[in-house]
Amino acid sequence: MAKEKFERSKPHVNIGTIGHVDHGKTTLTAAITKQFGDFQDYASIDSAPEERARGITISTAHVEYETENRHYAHVDCPGHADYVKNMITGAAQMDGAILVVNAADGPMPQTREHILLGRQVGIPYMVVYMNKVDQVDDEELLELVEMEIRELLSSYEYPGDDIPVIPGSALAALEGRDDAIGKDSIDKLMAAVDEYIPTPARAVDQPFLMPIEDVFSISGRGTVVTGRVERGVINVGDEISIVGIRDTTKTTCTGVEMFRKLLDRGEAGDNIGALLRGVDREGVERGQVLCKPGSVDPHTKFEAEAYILTKEEGGRHTPFFANYRPQFYFRTTDVTGTVNLPAGTEMVMPGDNLKFEVELIAPIAMEDGLRFAIREGGRTVGAGVVAKIIE
């Protein structure tokens, strides 16, 4: 099955397995690689190495495989805390997820939590694998569990009635027995993933955005801002907006430079300098973004989903309370903000993950799904994602 050479001709999609502990996420991951990739056994996936993302230690296993139609990068995490951190930091961005539910147990607390997190952090699509069906003798019971899963998904605003639910046994597939619930179920699952989870728009095809990292003035030519283009394309002559921190202004890009060479355009992934017409050195600063006019607005108030580091991870040693005022680091800059805790929450302990409201002292170019770090005096004490913009 293994391909000699990685062909970049197929569209690429990032997915992962989510769900309650011991429901079979890692076994399923192994079974998929057995049929569609270079086989990785359970042990090698389960002993995932630790990585650091935004100062947070996360264990994540990365595997890749391909179907007729697509190439997939797939993440699987050994522990529940790793999932929470992964989803919140966006360390492994997912275009869709395979929710694994044990048919004998039905949805459990972490099943719920992962669906809620998926909704908050913007995982747009889910496909369900109902695992361990050989442990349930009663056909009606399977139907009830499926209904329960669909209702749970609907309650978190996923289209529960439309989401594919594939019954099977990942272990049977891995051990090469009972093809009807084993191997065939994995084929059905990947066919559903192929069809139901759309290929995301490539970064280049999205509206232009570049966080400003530095500002220079070049005598006789004007002001140059530098940064890495996050998405889209900028052409010489394009009208662009400068958004965040101050009032939004418009300007025209009169030149694009990369490695000291003049180009006609810069695109997603490029580190460029953009020459701005009629903007003086004081008129623009790090922390603002250049973007396609009207594509992103500045905001100060939002609902966040956040993970607070433990003291072992270098975070706080003590809890924080209402009106906590740390810095929120968005893209390239820190902005002070006040935390408004949800009703009934008195304090937040290191190691907690929760939802709260934030009000910043200056507006930031913001959209749902934007990641940030929570810092105190330059030290990271948490990570979060904009779940919903309020104003």
From Swiss-Prot:
Where is Mg(2+) bound in this sequence?
Answer: T26
Question: What keyword terms does UniProt attach to this protein?
Answer: Cytoplasm, Elongation factor, GTP-binding, Hydrolase, Magnesium, Metal-binding, Nucleotide-binding, Protein biosynthesis
Q: What Pfam families does UniProt report for this protein, alphabetically?
A: GTP_EFTU (PF00009), GTP_EFTU_D2 (PF03144), GTP_EFTU_D3 (PF03143)
Q: Which GO terms describe its molecular function?
A: GTP binding; GTPase activity; guanosine tetraphosphate binding; translation elongation factor activity
Q: What is its main location?
A: cytoplasm
Q: What class of enzyme is it?
A: hydrolase
G1: annotated span: 19-26
List GO terms (cellular component aspect). cytoplasm
Entry-linked PROSITE patterns: G_TR_1, G_TR_2
> Its function?
GTP hydrolase that promotes the GTP-dependent binding of aminoacyl-tRNA to the A-site of ribosomes during protein biosynthesis.
Subunit annotation: Monomer.
Q: What is this protein called?
A: Elongation factor Tu
Q: Which organism is it from?
A: Jannaschia sp. (strain CCS1)
